Amino acid sequence: MTKTPEMTKTAIAHGKYIRGSASKVRRVLDQIRGKSYRDALIMLEFMPYRSTDPITKVLRSAVANAEHNLGMDPSSLVISSASADNGPVMKRFRPRAQGRAFSIKKQTCHISISVESAPNQTNTEAQN
């Protein structure tokens, strides 16, 4: 008899139109992906990047969604996926000498973070 895998509950949060480059946000998301919620918060607090503030806000929102909508325990949550996509670019111009103008591109990005409950250690030990 084969056992069907249990459906894992996943809570998702999105942050849209965040000022900052998607590539700079991705370097932070790559470091917290797969970590527990508590470890990720500690890492984000001490990273020297500007993008950690909006990422922390989206992460807290995902955990609040898991706690309120799905009734999950925040201490058992793990970041299952985290991604940053390019958003619209605000184009501005800086006046230069002799009537010229240089373009300024103000990048935005969309951050998506999903959390799910960590696999229970006692269940895996009992199955072995």
UniProtKB/Swiss-Prot annotation:
InterPro entries, per database record: Ribosomal_uL22, Ribosomal_uL22_bac/chlpt-type, Ribosomal_uL22_bac/org-type, Ribosomal_uL22_CS, Ribosomal_uL22_sf
Record carries keyword S-adenosyl-L-methionine: no
CDD domains the UniProt entry points to: Ribosomal_L22
Gene3D superfamilies: Ribosomal protein L22/L17
Any GO BP annotation: translation
Record-linked Pfam families: Ribosomal_L22
Signal peptide: none
Gene Ontology, cellular component aspect: cytosolic large ribosomal subunit
UniProt keyword Protein transport present: no
GO molecular function, one term: rRNA binding
Keywords linked to the UniProt accession: Ribonucleoprotein, Ribosomal protein, RNA-binding, rRNA-binding
Superkingdom field: Bacteria
Family: Belongs to the universal ribosomal protein uL22 family.
Entry-linked PANTHER family: CHLOROPLAST 50S RIBOSOMAL PROTEIN L22-RELATED, LARGE RIBOSOMAL SUBUNIT PROTEIN UL22M
Functional note: This protein binds specifically to 23S rRNA; its binding is stimulated by other ribosomal proteins, e.g. L4, L17, and L20. It is important during the early stages of 50S assembly. It makes multiple contacts with different domains of the 23S rRNA in the assembled 50S subunit and ribosome. The globular domain of the protein is located near the polypeptide exit tunnel on the outside of the subunit, while an extended beta-hairpin is found that lines the wall of the exit tunnel in the center of the 70S ribosome.
Subunit structure: Part of the 50S ribosomal subunit.
Protein name, UniProt field: Large ribosomal subunit protein uL22
